[in-house]
């Protein structure tokens, strides 16, 4: 960028506007504009966004869109979709969007159309999934597969496990699907404790087939299998790989015909719609997986073509910048009111925090402003009985994303009362209303509350929320929802001028761990860390 972000006219215009708006209450904004709740909405790819309960005016939105133009967002978006190497620190294109491009599309990387490669892998995945799901893929002893265990970590785990839990309603119930990620042996032991080796298939997901945690778990899973079946040949019937390292895969004992590849233009946290999603395809079937991809593509097209002022990822991204950089908000709460989305906040933690948790700009200069927020959350209504107290009456401003579905997948009547889903949705609407408008001291006193107690019953309100209301949770709408957040993160990375597609921050600890693990196994060599680390290692040696 030619000028530091905070020195640009667009930023300074927003700063001046903030000084006049930051003390204005949402009560006043709604009172001045009776149609605000219907006007400040947007729709795309089957998702409906109500952003009227944000501390913004039309002028705010115009200034935010002007900032996006000033930072070159449309051009950067087109560069990403066009296959330019926008991951500058690794010299790579960023083309997770190609993973869901329809057959016949053209997406070029170094002059070569990669879409045929994507669909060739998808067809191989589908053929394999059909074999397993139909029972025609037999294990070493001739029994069909009844359990799938995905072994991966980071993007090779968080996306698949989130999507599997989200789409469990559509899964083949005869198949047990589990996910092992933590190098803590407890994870593998507990996930395999009640499984039968003869009927278990492991998917080892590691692009390089060298990821420390994944390969430790894979080797232990291999030993578990062989302890039951004895024959090395069994590995080829009970393990498949998602990788590009054919030599290492073959050495492990996996038939390379059962190795499903993906590409260096796919980042780990953006890879769940590649072969990394094989476990999900096994669960929901090839048709369901293709519907998921269609939902991703729906949002890709919306992001690529919709005007910025009506573009869901752009609006959500810019609103996040507004609170992060002007109001000083440090976190974002993601609150899905659907139990199937229990893992969605954890998935977004990696997507957002690994992407935009950066302290230097694209050209290596230290930033002078805040970048990515801390992302967290829990399904409703559980969170209401845990941390909503702080959101309502605490001293920290916490913008919230509420996600809800008009139709439940599990209608459950309540004898003598409203259906469960009506109870759930009533809480969605009540929470966003309470957060926006609160309750004044005068209103509390008018209810006859004792004057000494009344201050404790006051809700300041003016807490900003977005509400995403979707008709129904399906593979297609889930794909659109995930892509919405992918592109929102991209928008913010462009505004902050950071590389949203590398993750150097995870490297230093990994390097040190490789050194330390050798030191844990013996009293020598002499430790040469800081005094704290040395003391902790010695104590561990003594007490293990």
Curated annotation (Swiss-Prot):
Upper taxonomic lineage: Bacteria, Thermotogati, Deinococcota, Deinococci, Deinococcales
Reaction(s) the record says it catalyses: alpha-D-glucose 6-phosphate = beta-D-fructose 6-phosphate
Example of a GO biological process term: gluconeogenesis
Family: Belongs to the GPI family.
Organism: Deinococcus deserti (strain DSM 17065 / CIP 109153 / LMG 22923 / VCD115)
HAMAP family: G6P_isomerase
EC number: 5.3.1.9
CDD domains: SIS_PGI_1 (cd05015), SIS_PGI_2 (cd05016)
Domain of life: Bacteria
Disulfide bonds: none
Pathway this chain belongs to: Carbohydrate biosynthesis; gluconeogenesis; Carbohydrate degradation; glycolysis; D-glyceraldehyde 3-phosphate and glycerone phosphate from D-glucose: step 2/4
Role noted for this protein: Catalyzes the reversible isomerization of glucose-6-phosphate to fructose-6-phosphate.
Main subcellular localisation: cytoplasm
Pfam families: PGI
Listed GO MF terms: carbohydrate derivative binding; glucose-6-phosphate isomerase activity; monosaccharide binding
Enzyme class, spelled out: isomerase
Active site location: 354 (proton donor), 385, 510
Official protein name in the record: Glucose-6-phosphate isomerase
Cellular localisation: Cytoplasm
UniProt KW keywords: Cytoplasm, Gluconeogenesis, Glycolysis, Isomerase
InterPro entries: G6P_Isomerase, G6P_Isomerase_C, Phosphoglucose_isomerase_CS, SIS_dom_sf, SIS_PGI_1, SIS_PGI_2
GO CC annotation: cytosol
């Amino acid at each position: 960028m030619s000028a530091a972000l905070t020195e640009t006219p667009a930023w300074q215009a927003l700063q001046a506007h903030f000084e006049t708006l930051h003390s204005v209450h949402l009560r006043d904004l709604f009172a001045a504009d009776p149609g605000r709740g219907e006007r400040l909405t947007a729709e795309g790819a089957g998702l409906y966004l109500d952003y009227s309960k944000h501390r913004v005016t039309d002028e705010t939105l115009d200034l935010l869109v002007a900032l996006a133009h000033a930072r070159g967002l449309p051009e950067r978006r087109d560069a990403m979709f066009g296959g330019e190497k926008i991951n500058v620190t690794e010299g790579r294109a960023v083309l997770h969007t190609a993973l869901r491009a329809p057959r016949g599309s053209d997406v070029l990387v170094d002059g070569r159309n990669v879409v045929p490669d994507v669909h060739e892998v998808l067809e191989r995945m589908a053929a394999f999934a059909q074999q397993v799901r139909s029972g025609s893929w037999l294990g070493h002893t001739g029994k069909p597969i009844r359990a799938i265990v995905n072994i991966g970590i980071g993007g090779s785990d968080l996306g698949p496990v989130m999507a599997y839990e989200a789409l469990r309603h559509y899964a083949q119930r005869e198949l047990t699907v589990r996910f092992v990620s933590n190098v803590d042996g407890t994870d593998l032991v507990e996930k395999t404790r009640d499984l039968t080796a003869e009927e278990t298939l492991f998917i080892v997901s590691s692009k390089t087939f060298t990821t420390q945690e994944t390969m430790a778990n894979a080797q232990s899973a291999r030993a578990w299998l062989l302890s039951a079946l004895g024959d090395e040949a069994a590995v080829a019937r009970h393990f498949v790989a998602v990788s590009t390292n054919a030599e290492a895969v073959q050495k492990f004992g996996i038939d390379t015909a059962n190795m499903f590849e993906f590409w260096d233009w796919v980042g780990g946290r953006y890879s769940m719609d590649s072969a990394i999603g094989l476990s999900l395809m096994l669960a929901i079937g090839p048709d369901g997986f293709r519907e998921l991809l269609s939902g991703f593509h729906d949002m890709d097209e919306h992001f690529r073509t919709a005007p910025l002022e009506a573009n869901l990822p752009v609006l959500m991204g810019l609103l996040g910048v507004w609170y992060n950089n002007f109001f000083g908000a440090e976190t974002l709460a993601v609150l899905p009111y659907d139990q199937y989305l229990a893992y969605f906040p954890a998935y977004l933690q990696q997507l957002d925090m690994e992407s935009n948790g950066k302290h230097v700009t694209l050209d290596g200069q230290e930033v002078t402003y805040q970048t990515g927020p801390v992302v967290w959350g829990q399904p409703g209504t559980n969170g209401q009985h845990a941390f909503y107290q702080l959101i309502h009456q605490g001293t920290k401003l916490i913008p919230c994303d509420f996600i809800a579905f008009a139709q439940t997948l599990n209608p459950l009547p309540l004898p003598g009362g409203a259906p469960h889903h009506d109870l759930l949705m009533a809480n969605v609407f009540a929470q966003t209303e309470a957060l926006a408008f609160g309750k004044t001291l005068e209103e509390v006193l008018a209810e006859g509350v004792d004057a000494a107690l009344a201050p404790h019953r006051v809700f300041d309100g003016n807490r900003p929320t977005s509400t995403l209301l979707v008709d129904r949770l399906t593979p297609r709408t889930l794909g659109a929802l995930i892509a919405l957040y992918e592109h929102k993160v991209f928008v913010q990375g462009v505004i902050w001028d950071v590389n949203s597609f590398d993750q150097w921050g995870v490297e230093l600890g990994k390097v040190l761990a490789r050194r330390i693990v050798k030191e844990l196994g013996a009293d020598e060599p002499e430790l040469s860390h800081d005094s704290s680390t040395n003391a902790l290692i010695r104590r561990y040696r003594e007490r293990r």
